[in-house]
From Swiss-Prot:
Keyword Ribonucleoprotein: no
GO BP: any one term: DNA repair
Region (Head domain (RuvB-H)): 255-344
Originating gene: ruvB
Protein name: Holliday junction branch migration complex subunit RuvB
């Protein structure tokens, strides 16, 4: 069973996310620095009648990378083609996609860090020269021909920028770090989404949902849908603070936005490893989750909120974690010193 607070896309998110996505960059809430830069680059490219330079969006999942790609395509008056690194298994698969593009189209590759090397190398001339090198024949009779491609924009999205090879990363002209949203930004998103859903919500109710949404719009919208269900069944016409709080408690999402898995991680570090340090592989094994899942999904938010600290020797529970679980920290382990951002 998937967690309701997972930032990864769930099956139920698909259709609702499409209806909730803003269509213009000035409608997009949050990520102000990213928006400002992209707005300038888009206007400059349109004034010169050129394709926008290739864009790399990196950061935790659920923060709006696909939405931004859709907005960029609309602003550039092109079509958006969406695929992912794991879906492109062979160089021929990518070549087939590239040859269907038109001028100013946007090719969005999610999880671009998972492209295999042979596929990645096809991208190099496509990104630099808008060209596709194809080898015809085999052995001594083989020859290479170059096909011209339209002036397109590649947008890559990744949660693991460190896993990108330098040659690929260096070919992106625009790099944008996506950051977690603050509660006021998420409150705006919840109020906007409620209007799209056709339900009424008070500012206090929206803020309560926002405060438990882990800084992630996807989670905020998902929680809003479940709170709406609760409110409708209880015959309430407006989602108030009371209804929002009751529904979220029923969903077992606490006031930090943590669920059982998050608290299990904190409990493991404190109760089973004496507050740490503990290696991420050991911790992953202990809680029964894959290493990549812990690094990509669970750890970033705990780091961002300052509940765990990443040190050269492993993960340490901070004083906030002890207080959250009602434990007393008797260790002098400098638990508030170390790396508290996953993307530094």
């Amino acid at each position: 069973m998937e967690r309701i607070v997972t930032p990864a896309e769930m099956f139920e998110d698909g259709n609702s996310e499409l209806s909730l996505r803003p269509q213009k960059i000035n409608e997009y809430i949050g990520q102000d620095k990213v928006k400002e830069r992209l707005n300038i680059f888009i206007k400059a490219a349109k004034n010169r009648k050129e394709a926008l330079d290739h864009v790399l969006l990196y950061g935790p999942p659920g923060l709006g990378k696909t939405t931004l790609a859709n907005i960029i395509a609309k602003e550039m008056t092109g079509d958006l083609k969406i695929t992912s690194g794991p879906a492109i298994e062979r160089a021929g698969d990518l070549a087939a996609i590239l040859t269907t593009l038109k001028d100013y189209d946007v090719l969005f590759i999610d999880e671009i860090h998972r492209l295999n090397r042979s596929v990645e190398e096809i991208l190099y001339p496509a990104m630099e020269d808008y060209a596709l090198d194809i080898v015809i024949g085999k052995g001594a009779a083989a020859k290479s021909i170059r096909l011209d491609l339209p002036k397109f924009t590649l947008i890559g999205a990744t949660t693991r920028i460190g896993m990108l090879t330098s040659p690929l990363r260096d070919r992106f002209g625009v790099l944008c770090a996506m950051e977690y949203y603050d509660e006021n930004q998420l409150k705006e998103i919840v109020i906007r989404s409620a209007a799209v859903f056709g339900c009424k919500i008070t500012e206090e109710g929206a803020l309560e949902i926002a405060s438990r949404s882990r800084g992630t719009p996807r989670i905020a919208n998902r929680l809003l849908k479940r709170v709406r269900d609760y409110s409708e069944v209880k015959s309430n016409t407006v989602i108030s603070l009371k209804e929002a709080r009751e529904a979220l408690e029923l969903l077992e999402v606490d006031n930090q936005g943590f669920d059982k898995v998050d608290n299990k991680i904190l409990e493991a570090i404190i109760d089973n490893f004496n507050g740490g340090p503990v290696g991420i592989e050991t911790l992953s094994y202990f809680i029964g989750e894959e290493l990549g899942t812990v690094e990509d999904v669970y750890e970033p938010y705990l780091l961002q909120k300052g509940f765990i600290v990443r040190t050269p020797r492993g993960r340490i529970a901070s004083d906030k974690a002890y207080k959250h679980l009602g434990r007393v920290n008797n260790k002098n382990n400098n638990s508030n010193k170390g790396q508290t951002s996953f993307f530094k």
